[in-house]
Amino acid sequence: MSNRFINQSRHAMLGICATLAISGFYACTDSYDLDDKGNIPTNLGKSIYEELENPSEASSLHGTFKTYLRLIDDLGYKEVMSKTGSKTVFAANDSAFNEFFKNNKWNAKSYEDLTESMKKQLFYTSILDNAILTEMLSNVESSNSSVTRGIAMKHQTSANATDTIYHVWASELPANNSYWTPYIKGGIDVVMDNTRPMMVHFTQEQMLNNGINSEDFAAITGRPYESGGTFIFKNKIIAKDVTCQNGYVNQTDGVIVPPGNMAQMIRESKDTKWFNRMLDRFCAPYYDAQTTLNYNDNALLNGKPMIDSIFQWRYFSERSQGAVALQRDPKQVALAQDMLLNFDPGWNQYYSTYGTMLADMGAMFVPDDEAVEDYFLNPSNGGYNILGLYAKKPL
């Protein structure tokens, strides 16, 4: 019975194709390729790769982009950037990369010093997986398909958890935290969070709608705000919305370096080690089967070493990934309420109970080491008595 149905269906489909062919339609034998040069609308210009390789005279891009193109080539992304698609790119030119190599958090002095993980972070963090004009960055589409303008301040990048796997050695593990003790001898492979990293942007419309003034911007980014400007993290867009066959190219005045989530920044900062020690009390490694599988599938395809187990560096909290509490330890033991932070400082995509992923961010006011030491070691401050009562060693 089923074979007869299949045969009848096959004859019906052949009949439909024949009818369409007679009528002048050729859908069943369509060889139309959007990537063929003759099929591309002239107003779309070049592909993103071609535009960066040889900027059009009509475009506002300036300088050369050999280093950025090298990232594309090394990561096997040339075909994607050369074909039709939907990407938004925020690229820095070679002069900006020269400045980056003079001073960066990885101490990379040249392109050759970049590891594959660093290359992935620099490249994938500078890309959005859809085509968005800069004036549309702060717009958010609601469930009823209407658009609310001027509220978004971040977008999900092309980066994945497997792009940022770190092997953490004993000297870098949280101190006085038994959850990490099994990994002191050989270290541990971790991702800081397995949700997609976000790109933070500041547009004039979003700043006006949310009461962010120039002084606020300077405090957040460390540079003055230029009226009408659009910034990606702290990098100003100096050439915008260059239309290409597969999306838009924007040029930034500096290399976009992912700052990491709040927990990472506190951990990596040179003058917040005491606050980081306090924060470390609330973290633990959680085995991540999906990230381990994803990484090893890719490693197998590309002939690279596989990793036995990859963990997430997570924080006990009332609000964590997926807006769900993380209130059990890695062994699924329930945690006391006083072991839960208000929210997870390592959650890349944090949003509050009344916000959205695109329009909301967390904030932490973190004292530097000097302030912490003064609070606990100065007899005139309240922390001095606390330390006297609970410190294991005398003051």
How would you name each of these model-derived features?
Residues 2-16:
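Bacterial N-terminal signal peptides that target proteins for export
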Residues 23-27:
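C-terminal motif of bacterial Sec signal peptides marking the signal peptidase cleavage site
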Residues 28-395:
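Mature, structured domains of secreted/extracytosolic soluble proteins
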